[in-house]
């Protein structure tokens, strides 16, 4: 610019040579190119999912660690389902309040894009929480010690941030990894967010992602017998 001005060119003439074509970008759903819209709507739900994993695994694992699992089962009538519901429902309520407050801050106070209204995203947040709890129960059922269970939860939760399509598009991944993304609740929440909050598509087109989140609720039933056996017979070794 200074060289051109020294040669007697006007600023308009110089800019025409430096940047002959000006890109006028208006992305759908985020016309301001606000990075906070992208970052907060992806990272914060991932943090919530990770915390649900850890709290679920820890709360069940401590029963095994401190040898209180038999008493816990007795309080639930020796039913693993009743015992899990009694332990996890208060956590569900707390995490749901936190998740809804997160939505209120982002979409209400900060006016982030919410093109399909509140209901689709609040429902997605609730399903993310209960599906993450179901995955957490599965984790501690597979590895019924606090140490290994928490390691599993931490690893799975941290991998979520990179494998579900936040930092690298899923379409560019190996086909095997593309299939594995379906195993993470956060992936389905992210797709719901893109369709409902950003693009404002009809709810019909996102029903499959809601169904996937509900499908994770099957996991505790698959591991329930093994978890109950661990609660009754497993001896914790420091």
Describe the predicted segments one by one.
Residues 1-55, 227:
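Transport-system extracytoplasmic interface segments
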Residues 8-13, 18, 79, 104, ...:
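Homeobox/homeodomain signature
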Residues 93, 101-105, 112-238:
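Membrane-spanning alpha-helical segments of multipass transporters and channels
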Residues 29-106:
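Hydrophobic alpha-helical transmembrane segments of multi-pass membrane transport proteins
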Residues 15, 24, 28-32, 72-85, ...:
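Juxtamembrane loop-helix boundary motifs flanking transmembrane segments in multi-pass membrane proteins
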């Amino acid at each position: 610019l200074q060289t051109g001005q020294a040669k007697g060119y006007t600023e308009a003439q110089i800019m025409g040579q430096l940047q002959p074509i000006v890109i006028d970008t208006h992305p759908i759903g985020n016309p301001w190119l606000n990075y906070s819209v992208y970052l907060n709507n992806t990272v914060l739900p991932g943090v919530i999912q990770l915390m649900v994993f850890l709290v679920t695994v820890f709360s069940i694992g401590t029963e095994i660690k401190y040898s209180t699992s038999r008493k816990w089962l007795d309080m639930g009538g020796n039913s693993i389902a009743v015992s899990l519901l009694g332990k996890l429902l208060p956590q569900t309520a707390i995490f749901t309040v936190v998740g809804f407050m997160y939505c209120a801050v982002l979409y209400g106070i900060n006016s982030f894009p919410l093109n399909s209204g509140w209901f689709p995203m609040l429902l997605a947040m609730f399903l993310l929480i209960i599906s993450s709890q179901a995955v957490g129960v599965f984790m501690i059922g597979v590895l019924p010690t606090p140490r290994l269970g928490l390691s599993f939860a931490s690893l799975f939760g941290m991998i979520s941030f990179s494998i579900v399509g936040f930092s690298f598009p899923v379409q560019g991944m190996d086909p095997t990894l593309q299939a594995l993304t379906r195993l993470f609740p956060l992936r389905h929440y992210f797709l719901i967010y893109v369709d409902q909050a950003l693009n404002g598509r009809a709810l019909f087109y996102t029903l499959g992602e809601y169904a996937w989140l509900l499908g994770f609720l099957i996991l505790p039933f698959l591991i329930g017998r093994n978890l109950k056996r661990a609660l009754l017979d497993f001896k914790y070794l420091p």
